[in-house]
UniProtKB/Swiss-Prot annotation:
A motif (LPXTG sorting signal) lies at residues 1503-1507. Residues 1-50 form the signal peptide. Keywords: Cell wall, Peptidoglycan-anchor, Repeat, Secreted, Signal. Residues 50-156, 840-951, 1459-1480 are annotated as: Disordered. It is a peptidoglycan-anchor. Residues 1507-1528 form a propeptide. This is Cell surface antigen I/II. It holds the Pfam family Antigen_C.
Amino acid sequence: MLQKCKLEGIIICNEKRLLGAAKVKSGRTLSGALLGTAILASGAGQKALAEETSTTSTSGGDTAVVGTETGNPATNLPDKQDNPSSQAETSQAQARQKTGAMSVDVSTSELDEAAKSPQEAGVTVSQDATVNKGTVEPSDEANQKEPEIKDDYSKQAADIQKATEDYKASVAANQAETDRINQEIAAKKAQYEQDLAANKAEVERSLMRMRKPRPIYEAKLAQNQKDLAAIQQANSDSQAAYAAAKEAYDKEWARVQAANAAAKKAYEEALAANTAKNDQIKAEIEAIQQRSAKADYEAKLAQYEKDLAAAQAGNAANEADYQAKKAAYEQELARVQAANAAAKQAYEQALAANSAKNAQITAENEAIQQNAQAKADYEAKLAQYQKDLAAAQSGNAANEADYQEKLAAYEKELARVQAANAAAKQAYEQQVQQANAKNAEITEANRAIRERNAKAKTDYELKLSKYQEELAQYKKDLAEYPAKLQAYQDEQAAIKAALAELEKHKNEDGNLSEPSAQSLVYDLEPNAQVALVTDGKLLKASALDEAFSHDEKNYNNHLLQPDNLNVTYLEQADDVASSVELFGNFGDKAGWTTTVSNGAEVKFASVLLKRGQSATATYTNLKNSYYNGKKISKVVYKYTVDPDSKFQNPTGNVWLGIFTDPTLGVFASAYTGQNEKDTSIFIKNEFTFYDEDGNPIDFDNALLSVASLNREHNSIEMAKDYSGTFVKISGSSIGEKNGMIYATDTLNFKKGEGGSLHTMYTRASEPGSGWDSADAPNSWYGAGAVRMSGPNNYITLGATSATNVLSLAEMPQVPGKDNTAGKKPNIWYSLNGKIRAVNVPKVTKEKPTPPVEPTKPDEPTYEVEKELVDLPVEPKYEPEPTPPSKNPDQSIPEKPVEPTYEVEKELEPAPVEPSYEKEPTPPQSTPDQEEPEKPVEPSYQSLPTPPVEPVYETVPGPVSVPTVRYHYYKLAVQPGVTKEIKNQDDLDIDKTLVAKQSTVKFQLKTADLPAGRPETTSFVLMDPLPSGYQLNLEATKVASPGFEASYDAMTHTVTFTATAETLAALNQDLTKAVATIYPTVVGQVLNDGATYTNNFTLMVNDAYGIKSNIVRVTTPGKPNDPDNPSNNYITPHKVNKNENGVVIDGKSVLAGTTNYYELTWDLDQYKGDKSAKEIIQKGFFYVDDYPEEALDLRTDLIKLTDANGKAVTGVSVADYASLEAAPAAVQDMLKKANIIPKGAFQVFTADDPQAFYDAYVVTGTDLTIVTPMTVKAEMGKTGGSYENRAYQIDFGNGYESNLVVNNVPKINPEKDVTLTMDPADSTNVDGQTIALNQVFNYRLIGGIIPADHAEELFEYSFSDDYDQTGDQYTGQYKAFAKVDLTLKDGTIIKAGTDLTSYTEAQVDEANGQIVVTFKEDFLRSVSVDSAFQAEVYLQMKRIAVGTFANTYVNTVNGITYSSNTVRTSTPEPKQPSPVDPKTTTTVVFQPRQGKAYQPAPPAGAQLPATGDSSNAYLPLLGLVSLTAGFSC
């Protein structure tokens, strides 16, 4: 079985058979071509780094920050780190791998010479196999092994020479030794026989002497054993008795110890309690002594000392008694126990008597209530108090009378001054009102002018900016146009010439039968990204892995073979994924091969579809594709399973593996483990290509490759149902028949079978075989092309059993093969633009359009604002008289308090320490009797020892001929390499954190080269740099002397080649090890939240290569960083709070309210940072771009604290009216961070960046800045929203906070004139006539406070300065809720509810001033989530003729707001005619001037009264009003 693997054209893969063996595709050349293509296509573009420029703007409040895909709101350098280049990925995947080695040569001349001589002496010489000393890595290990080998060669030579000499000497010595030994053997044997005869005679004599003393010894021994038994029994009895006595002693001793311990414990506790009690009594005595008279104290002290001496004497007697009893206890235990009992009884009786006595003393103390001396003092003080009280009362009465007289005079003068000032004020306010009205009109007109001017300026600046950009682009395009046009014309001319030449050869093999240029360049996209949408099911990567694992042989050999994948393993419920998951030879399968692209990395997403279901794939990040020279940005494919497919999977499922590279296409399979007859599988492909502007590309005869269409005896691969026109390649087996593209006339599998001219696979004996390979010269044999037009195209591709297309009669017969045999229902195909015909020219140049110069916009003419009129000068008012000062009353003397008398207490005597029992005497052990002495057995004379037969020395045999062996060694070395990563201060930063824009240096170090190495002819180091790393090539060259440095921008790789001088130094003495020098890469890291991983490759003499270790460093802003657990997004945060610390973001804020902005300086992600001093000196700043048009700074309230609540030191704050007003250093700092404040702003600056870094940054300590700002009063008059944003700037990198928006409600109080106090009656008689003596109301409608406001109301009042010459306040007013109110406890007060009881009024009728104020506790009880608005009705009576104007002031939380002005007129009343009984008479009552009003809770619908209590005229008010109404 074979899965075909190709990268170009429409590639179709299915089951193949070839004589029972696997069909192997030619892949070596293709792999090399792919590698070259990948190297050219995968360059990581570099971005120029300039602090003065950036890619985003934050000058407008609504401008979004670019680059937020990093998760960090960066204002400069916001881009996300690109994917690593394929070179970097491959290099790091092979980290520490080595290829080849450096051989080491050690001289063998000494050993060679030594091996020649031994044979002359008869010694055998043999050479062993060469010993491999291995391949070592460290050079010092090689330096160690070389002397070892050299020493061993010398040792082998010496051993050979020594073995030869030794053999010669051994042969001569052997014969002399043999003669000597034979002589010694004969002498020893004769002496032994003589000694043996003498010994035998002496043994007989000794036996006769030993038979006499034995019986006596045996009798003594028997008596000894009898005595021993008796003594042992006696000793055993004695020991038993001692043991019993010892046991009784141990028990008694333990009992006595316990009893004594208990007695001692009880004594010590009693003593401690007594001491504590006495200490308490002493303290009480000392306190009493301090409060009592000295004489009484001294008397009691003398008594105490007397009693104390007595107690101490008693205690001494007790101690003596205790000592006596203790001595008696130690003499006799039984008597002591009896005495102890008697002593205890006596002690307890004494203790009881003592307690009774103390109780009696306590009772006597309580009976004593006073002290005679203290009582006398108290009575004297009381008499003096009564005398002083009478004098004070008399003086205060006279003082009050004097004050009342002065007060009357003051009030009279005050009334006169106030009346005069009121008249002057009224005239002034009318003038101010007129001026303000005029200025309001001018201000509104000027505001409109400013808006029109600003809009005109903004439009102009936008047009001018766009014009300048277009002009720059125009100039650039104009400069480039001639070259582009010439290049395009040259290419078109070359294509035209090529097509003319091809027309001559169009009927020759391999040429397009209809010559055409290829306008579609679409061959390879390894970096493409794919997104999927499907009505089928997405599959998990783990499900694919499990399914491939059932192909055990290939899977165990790390080969992924889709052709063998069984679809049934993908049909489990838990195989379904919720999102796209990629699978392939990457990740944990890096290094595996696939039948799609051998060892190159392949990724694919998987879906499970049924007939008629689709998957739509969108391919982006295309790098290499063009149409007519114009970049292709996106391709969209819709893959649909053809409903007419005849595969036989019972579930109807088809697996689609959709490759991330769109030119690799799709693998489709319904294979369930069995070959199927009469089967087929087809996939419809609908596709659209898009240009760089996102517009569909309208193809005009673009060519799409149809390649590798195989036909065997039982299987046909084909294309059908396509939107284009088929173009045949001359000589190809592929044609078009019945709307299908396939090998129509012959098979094309094997030469000679079914008319095939070539074999699809390579055969060494067949020229032209192997056509089914992308790089085969005759790959056109199985290919064709389709010419496509229009934006939307389609083609269906698949594989089918031959029986579905042709009858058996139409099929060629191949001997030994069955045309109806089953096949796998699967296919791999791809669509791309690589046409297999020969010499097809490609269109690579886009036809340039002549640039058109843009038109410069005209600057607008701005309108001029009008000047405001001057306000009138406020008159000078008479100062009011100073109120009389009342002399303060004399203070009433304090009445003395009668004392409480105390008496001292006596000390309690200490308890007597008890006596203790004497411990028992331990028993004495009886000593054991001594055992009898055992009799001594008599000694016997030993028998003489017989002589020992001598050992005869063995005669040596002949000397054996030695074999001397020797061997040679071979040794190789693989010098190691090390990559190090340093900051600008040369500190190691591997697996650590440094700031964005930091300089990062990579040092490429190589170990010493060993002695005995071959000559070094080349020494090259290649470093594929990480994406987002900005190489400084010039600095790199300076830091790398001894190397030539070059940079390939396409692959983002820097290469170091040793100079001739460096090579000469390495080769100066090959017999000695040599140290290497190393180059250094210098550059900057440019991305937030990025990890920069890197290694390099060393290649020596093109024979030894090694890849280094991997180093990595991370920039802040990356969550879940395994190297830096504290790393996280850089998110400065801003929140608005009220004075109680409640967050008020988004809430309505009243004018005059202080916003407590809380700014978070987010530093926790920098914990453990290893940035260099150079970038630390760029500083640390926090910028608050506050709305100065709405807020006033409260710099006196600014606070900075750290995460632990401690005050932050070393940070200065400054505020600037605008960017232009800031110092140049601040402007430069903001410019580099790409931050443009809209107006005024604050800057918090770390005074000493290094100290700030050490204290807060490297420790990851977040800081909190509280910067209060008060809403300007004017905002309440106009209303409107204001917004606030902040920025933190760390290491020169800016990050934007969230935007905080609040709204200031417009407080717009209104005033009406009404005839009723009914809130439901909205009739307003403003501007109308009020009859003389008519009662009416001023309706004061307070400003509305919207719901969800930021802070509690604490002030809400109505101040009405009415014209008292025409209006008279009746003393009545009402307050009503204008909107529904919700209190904090949940109570709801409906609109229209009487709120008068929650108010209080102050009335000044003389000056026509009434102030109605809501009580603060009521206002604070209203929930901030509730709206608030109230209205007040002031009842008035018209008392004069004329026109009267009235305005009131609504005060809300300290800010005043003026209402509109109402005007009413009263004409002269008509003169009454003679009195007629039917005529109504008007009665006028003049109320007396009242006092300030304090309302009581409302009762029913009664009006509150503010006048004198004798307002008897009130019942007639209705009559008066009615009469007045008809009097004119």
